UniProtKB/Swiss-Prot annotation:
InterPro entries: Cytidylyl_trans, KdsB, Nucleotide-diphossugar_trans
Record family assignment: Belongs to the KdsB family.
Superkingdom assignment: Bacteria
Annotated GO CC locations: cytosol
Gene Ontology biological-process entries: CMP-keto-3-deoxy-D-manno-octulosonic acid biosynthetic process; lipopolysaccharide biosynthetic process
GO MF entries: 3-deoxy-manno-octulosonate cytidylyltransferase activity
HAMAP family, per the entry: KdsB
Species assigned in the record: Rickettsia conorii (strain ATCC VR-613 / Malish 7)
Localisation per UniProt entry: Cytoplasm
Name of the featured protein: 3-deoxy-manno-octulosonate cytidylyltransferase
Catalytic activities: 3-deoxy-alpha-D-manno-oct-2-ulosonate + CTP = CMP-3-deoxy-beta-D-manno-octulosonate + diphosphate
SUPFAM superfamilies the record matches: Nucleotide-diphospho-sugar transferases (SSF53448)
Pfam families xref list: CTP_transf_3
Keywords of this entry: Cytoplasm, Lipopolysaccharide biosynthesis, Nucleotidyltransferase, Transferase
Length: 246
């Protein structure tokens, strides 16, 4: 299999403040977390894991042949859970890159994951994350995050506000990250920063501590499920693509 030095980790915890038992919600006849895993697994990497504190989530994943790493329920963030899972991977000394894929994107495209990996390996960035060009109407929701970049595509700032102010086209941030191993180790050793806490965005801890984030353009904004309304949209999307035979 390709990219033997890369691990993909999907953090998933059962408790959710906005949508009860979110990972186990059904989209069609399949749970959200199973759909995420199956999409990610199409990238074809051996080291693909779901990191969870839940026996129920673990059961769903192992039944479809996936690998699970149990992590403590007290772990505060998805990135921290990703690192804890990485430490428990057998022979992890051979892994140099870790990709964190959020467990709430049921239709994530495997090509986006592979693009992160290739870009990370062929650049000097500490972290790489995907972005999508969108218009103003597409990023009005407060849960959306936009990013400002320099001419080389290096991230300058992430915000829940629309940046840059006054623009008609924006760069939407997709919540996936490719880390170099040493960058992930450094990240989890650092305390949450002022901007991170203000914006409620972990990636600002990277920038505030002088590390670099590269961005790679992908074509589509993936559906993220955080609320009951999001779930309804995901179910509708699934029904539509099913009718088309996709």
């Amino acid at each position: 299999m390709r990219h033997q030095d890369v691990a993909i980790i999907i953090p998933s915890r059962l408790s959710s403040t906005r949508l009860k038992q979110k990972p186990l919600q059904l989209i069609g006849s399949i749970t959200l977390i199973e759909r995420v895993f199956k999409q990610v697994n199409q990238a074809g990497l051996e080291h693909t894991y779901v990191a969870t504190d839940s026996e129920e989530i673990a059961s769903v994943i192992t039944k479809v042949g996936g690998k699970v790493i149990f992590t403590d329920s007290a772990i505060p963030t998805g990135t921290d859970r990703t690192y804890e899972a990485f430490k428990l991977i057998p022979n992890n000394q051979n892994i140099n890159y870790i990709v964190n894929v959020q467990g709430d994107m049921p239709f994530i495209e495997p090509s986006s994951i592979l693009k992160i990996i290739e870009y990370l390996k062929n650049s000097k960035y500490d972290v790489v994350t995907p972005i999508v060009k969108v218009d103003r109407e597409s990023v009005k929701a407060s849960s959306n995050v936009t990013v400002a970049v320099d001419s080389a595509g290096t991230a300058l700032y992430f915000s829940r506000s629309l940046i840059p102010n006054g623009a008609e086209e924006f760069l939407y941030h997709v919540g996936m990250y490719g880390f170099r191993k040493n960058a992930l180790e450094k990240f989890v050793s650092l305390k949450p920063t002022f901007l991170e806490k203000t914006e409620r965005l972990e990636q600002l801890r990277v920038l505030e501590n002088g590390m670099t984030i590269g961005t790679c353009l992908v074509e589509n904004v993936p559906i993220s499920v955080d609320t009951e309304e999001d779930l309804k949209k995901a179910v509708k999307f699934y029904e539509n693509i099913s009718k088309l035979g996709l």
